[in-house]
Amino acid sequence: MMNPSHGRGLGSAGGSSSGRNQGGGGETVVEMFPSGLRVLVVDDDPTCLMILERMLRTCLYEVTKCNRAEMALSLLRKNKHGFDIVISDVHMPDMDGFKLLEHVGLEMDLPVIMMSADDSKSVVLKGVTHGAVDYLIKPVRMEALKNIWQHVVRKRRSEWSVPEHSGSIEETGERQQQQHRGGGGGAAVSGGEDAVDDNSSSVNEGNNWRSSSRKRKDEEGEEQGDDKDEDASNLKKPRVVWSVELHQQFVAAVNQLGVEKAVPKKILELMNVPGLTRENVASHLQKYRIYLRRLGGVSQHQGNLNNSFMTGQDASFGPLSTLNGFDLQALAVTGQLPAQSLAQLQAAGLGRPAMVSKSGLPVSSIVDERSIFSFDNTKTRFGEGLGHHGQQPQQQPQMNLLHGVPTGLQQQLPMGNRMSIQQQIAAVRAGNSVQNNGMLMPLAGQQSLPRGPPPMLTSSQSSIRQPMLSNRISERSGFSGRNNIPESSRVLPTSYTNLTTQHSSSSMPYNNFQPELPVNSFPLASAPGISVPVRKATSYQEEVNSSEAGFTTPSYDMFTTRQNDWDLRNIGIAFDSHQDSESAAFSASEAYSSSSMSRHNTTVAATEHGRNHQQPPSGMVQHHQVYADGNGGSVRVKSERVATDTATMAFHEQYSNQEDLMSALLKQEGIAPVDGEFDFDAYSIDNIPV
């Protein structure tokens, strides 16, 4: 089965050529090179194996035949340097040709040519990818076998091009001894032939040595790589999971320091969480600021807009995102305020025109005449830096997000001396069950003020602010509709202002007209009044009682005329007039219309009716306000009823819906005014501020 002449192979032919070249010198090795090429053929088909052997011998190749793949592999292992190239079939019973290809490539590093009758692309591709240098389709042609020597030259040329790294001296000696042993084959050869054999065998052996050393280096590199991976995994810092509690601590620390002033070092000190590093906090802070910037995209452009929040008068507000000390963005982050609501609130605050009145005050600081209830905090609406009228109120800031957002039915009160509804009720209860508030005029039937030249109040001392008057009343009474400061420099008699309380004087701080009179709690309540002529040095007493003894909830419709449900007890005015034939008019209509009962140059005393009638319930408080005409001709008193706990509950039940309340107010504003001598008509359409 083995070819006995395979020992010489390419080495003998090349060696003899080389010897002749050295001796004679004219012939070249190239002419004799393919002769003696050592070929190992492996195929389970004996017919194919015989045909291949004959064709290869025709090409002057030295052929060794094997009909089993395992036998060929054992032969190669015994004599690694005995063959130059291997030709193997693909499909064999004992071992697949691709398996043999792998073993030869790993152990001997010889060029292998695959052959098969299967010419499918997948099989050819598989052979090439496994390391085959060529793929021959059966039946094999002579032209294909003549050129198989190219693969041997190409393989050795690539090996020679790589510089051979010599090992130790002992390894070099062993390789030389192996080269001498593998070159002979038992026959006597010339010195040139031995040199060529040693050269060819040394090439194969050096290649095997390099492949083995490369394997060792790869194994060592893998071990070192595993060690490096383990070291790198040990050097990695533990990952921080930002839970809800940890994020809340972070947000609290940022809010305490301020978003712009917060730095990772200070935040880490405030949080005081073990295992948390500065790098973790810095990374989370950067993401948190990006999140806030994305949420506050609307408010970033706020500084370039000229709106009422950022005018000179309202400069104390600061950015919209932190109204009244509340950080809306922080509320949004902690989940207390949705991101959609935050964007709507920020967008709602933009675009308000900055209107300024003639007196330098912003129009927003004047009480809105469209509604008697404020849907925003007066402190937020008017600002804290406006000290034009009276002293600044010292109150705690209340949370109010934006204009138009109802946070409670809060009454609009003037900026000066205020008296809340609860304080007025407390003052009434402290007065020995007196039904009149501090603004009520006590019974003065048996007493009169001192006569004589009364002291006068200058315009600076009597700067009465009454924002609830309509424009026509303000013009007639000498009050400006914008700043509510008397335009006339005329003085008012002291008798107009010296209104004292008979029972509870300590709870009536309104002598000599305070800088600002408090507005009644519910100005839309019924306003009964009396029209009485005025005469110098005369005392007047007027009392009006209702024709019905029952008490019902007060009507809030300004244009429905009803009788009063309870008495106005002990209404009396005593004053001196500085002019004759001048009258004081007291409005006597629920709709603020004029129903005057005047008598000139006559002493009028309205008799007292129904003293035993039912007294007003404790849940009702009467309010009276005095207005002095700037021309010195008349005095007007507006009497109103105030609902306390019981009536307030009824009011909330009647106007529990905000839309119903607004529609009722707008309906009242759209009715034409009632003509009268002294006009207490409803507010006209042209006076509605925009």
UniProtKB/Swiss-Prot annotation:
The modification 4-aspartylphosphate is found at D89. Induction: Down-regulated by gibberellin. Residues 1-27, 160-234 are annotated as: Disordered. Two-component system major event consists of a His-to-Asp phosphorelay between a sensor histidine kinase (HK) and a response regulator (RR). In plants, the His-to-Asp phosphorelay involves an additional intermediate named Histidine-containing phosphotransfer protein (HPt). This multistep phosphorelay consists of a His-Asp-His-Asp sequential transfer of a phosphate group between first a His and an Asp of the HK protein, followed by the transfer to a conserved His of the HPt protein and finally the transfer to an Asp in the receiver domain of the RR protein. GO terms for biological process: axillary shoot meristem initiation; callus formation; cellular response to cytokinin stimulus; cytokinin-activated signaling pathway; maintenance of shoot apical meristem identity; primary root development; regulation of anthocyanin metabolic process; regulation of chlorophyll biosynthetic process. Residues 239-289 bind DNA. Residues 220-232 have a biased composition (Acidic residues). One of its GO terms (molecular function) is DNA-binding transcription factor activity. InterPro entries: ARR-like (IPR045279), CheY-like_superfamily (IPR011006), Homeodomain-like_sf (IPR009057), Myb_dom (IPR017930), Myb_dom_plants (IPR006447), Response_reg_B-typ_pln (IPR017053), SANT/Myb (IPR001005), Sig_transdc_resp-reg_receiver (IPR001789). SUPFAM superfamilies: CheY-like, Homeodomain-like. It is found in: Nucleus. Pfam families: Myb_DNA-binding, Response_reg. Residues 8-27 have a biased composition (Gly residues). CDD domains: REC_typeB_ARR-like. A motif (Nuclear localization signal) lies at residues 236-239. Its main location: nucleus. Belongs to the ARR family. Type-B subfamily. Transcriptional activator that binds specifically to the DNA sequence 5'-[AG]GATT-3'. Functions as a response regulator involved in His-to-Asp phosphorelay signal transduction system. Phosphorylation of the Asp residue in the receiver domain activates the ability of the protein to promote the transcription of target genes. Could directly activate some type-A response regulators in response to cytokinins. Regulates SHY2 by binding to its promoter. Involved in the root-meristem size determination through the regulation of cell differentiation. PANTHER family: TWO-COMPONENT RESPONSE REGULATOR (PTHR43874), TWO-COMPONENT RESPONSE REGULATOR ARR1 (PTHR43874:SF119). Binds the target DNA as a monomer. Interacts with histidine-containing phosphotransfer proteins. This is Two-component response regulator ARR1. The lineage of its organism: Eukaryota, Viridiplantae, Streptophyta, Embryophyta, Tracheophyta. The gene is ARR1.
